[in-house]
């Protein structure tokens, strides 16, 4: 069956179908709808709003180090705030999966 979705709705569906277990995000257009649409798929994905982009990145990265598949979303400018933990992630690697 075909469904008409926005790009953010399709991203949320892809996150669910990829088996992501932890999703952390900082709200801000245009990425807010991704986390807002995930709960419709049930309790299989833990979703959390973070106080800033750095914390959102650290939550998702921590879950991936612990072996979970994790997803972090934020607007592009937020990558400046999240740069420090992203650089660390590049050196340490993950045990699960980590998508930003």
Regions found by a protein language model. Give the residues of each.
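Thiamine diphosphate
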Residues: 30-100
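Residue-level detector of functional hotspots within protein domains
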Residues: 1, 6-9, 65, 84
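Residue-level marker of alpha-helix boundaries and capping positions
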Residues: 2, 10, 25, 47-51, ...
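N-terminal glycine-rich anion-binding loops that anchor highly charged ligand groups
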Residues: 3-39, 58
